[in-house]
């Protein structure tokens, strides 16, 4: 099950019926038709639970007994598609939900009453996500929430609702419609709180924390590996120089303070500067050992 499906099923599992949620779903996934008896309304979804939810909402709010039809897609995904269909009280339903104008091209945004009411806004966002929302799986590490709209002004209305909850929503216009999106993990988690998907929010945060912990460990390991590589490289350079000095002039001819450092470096090529400093008969600071090693390298360069 994808993360998006898990979020939607959590919302639908709460069995809350909302007038504003229904308004968003119909506006974003509904289509109007004409029959001999008048207007018809069809709402299409690939989610069986959402289809059942719509059926219950029509019955609860308008005493409409709709039909749930289904067919199999013929494309590669071959998903089952559900259509919730009714030809009862369609004009009344559209007028009541302030949707009639949007279907006839006069009003494509979001009703001001929804934009100005927090609880109505929450319910509308919930419906919008159920209809056309998606969240990229947090395991991917690339956080993205999208809600697709047919009309640009509707996408901007969704963004306004999200911004009222202090979420950094942006809108991208496409050839066919527009997308309202969030990209920050914290905004996506807050959105899940807004629509009441608390379990999904906790799951998202858990995955995020695990990913960040793994990344921190990887960075630490990479840094440690790089430090070891630098230490070994510097050590080998010094060891080669000490061997050169030994062959040409003999280590015994080095100044006394350099002889012990040279011997220790040959005996312990894997030692860090601090380990060398601690191993001297008279312990030195790291800078003191570095100073002596630089002297040894300089002597070798001059030979």
Swiss-Prot record:
GO MF assignments: DNA binding
Please provide the record's keywords in A-Z order: Cell cycle, Cell division, DNA-binding
Q: Which residues bind DNA?
A: 272-303
Q: Which InterPro entries match?
A: Homing_endonucl, Sporu_reg_WhiA_N_dom, Sporulation_regulator_WhiA, Sporulation_regulator_WhiA_C, WhiA_LAGLIDADG_dom
Q: Does the keyword DNA-binding apply?
A: yes
Keyword Kinase in annotation: no
Record's Gene3D superfamilies? Homing endonucleases
Q: Give the stretches traversing the membrane.
A: none
Tell me the superkingdom of the source: Bacteria
Give GO BP annotations, semicolon-separated. cell division; regulation of sporulation
NCBIfam families the UniProt entry points to: DNA_bind_WhiA
Q: What does the function comment of this entry state? A: Involved in cell division and chromosome segregation.
Family from the record = Belongs to the WhiA family.
This one is known as Probable cell division protein WhiA
User: What organism does the record attribute this protein to?
Assistant: Streptococcus pneumoniae serotype 2 (strain D39 / NCTC 7466)
């Amino acid at each position: 099950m994808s993360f998006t499906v898990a979020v939607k099923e959590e919302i639908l599992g709460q069995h809350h019926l909302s007038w504003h949620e229904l308004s968003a779903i119909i506006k974003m996934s509904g289509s109007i038709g004409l029959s001999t008896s008048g207007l018809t309304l069809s709402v299409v979804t690939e989610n069986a639970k959402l289809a059942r939810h719509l059926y219950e909402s029509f019955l609860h709010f308008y005493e409409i007994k709709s039909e749930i039809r289904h067919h199999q897609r013929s494309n590669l995904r071959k998903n089952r598609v559900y259509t919730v269909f009714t030809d009862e009280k369609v004009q009344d339903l559209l007028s009541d939900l302030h949707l009639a104008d949007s279907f006839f091209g006069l009003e494509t945004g979001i009703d001001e009453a929804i934009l100005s009411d927090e609880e109505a806004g929450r319910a509308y966002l919930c419906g919008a996500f159920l209809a056309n929302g998606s969240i990229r799986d947090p395991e991917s590490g690339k956080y993205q929430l999208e809600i697709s709209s047919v009309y640009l002004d509707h996408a901007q209305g969704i963004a306004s609702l999200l911004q009222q909850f202090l979420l950094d929503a942006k809108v991208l216009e496409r050839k066919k419609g527009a997308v309202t999106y969030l990209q920050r993990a914290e905004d996506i988690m807050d959105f899940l709180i807004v629509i009441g998907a608390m379990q999904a929010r906790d799951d998202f945060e858990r995955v995020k924390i695990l990913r960040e912990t793994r990344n921190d460990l990887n960075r630490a390991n990479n840094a440690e590996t790089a430090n070891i590589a630098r230490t070994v490289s510097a050590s080998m350079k010094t060891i080669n120089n000490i061997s050169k000095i030994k062959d040409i002039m003999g280590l015994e001819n080095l100044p006394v303070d350099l002889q012990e450092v040279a011997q220790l470096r040959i005996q312990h090529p894997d030692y860090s500067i601090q380990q060398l400093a601690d191993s001297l008969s008279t312990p030195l600071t790291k800078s003191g050992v570095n100073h002596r090693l630089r002297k040894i390298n300089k002597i070798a360069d001059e030979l």
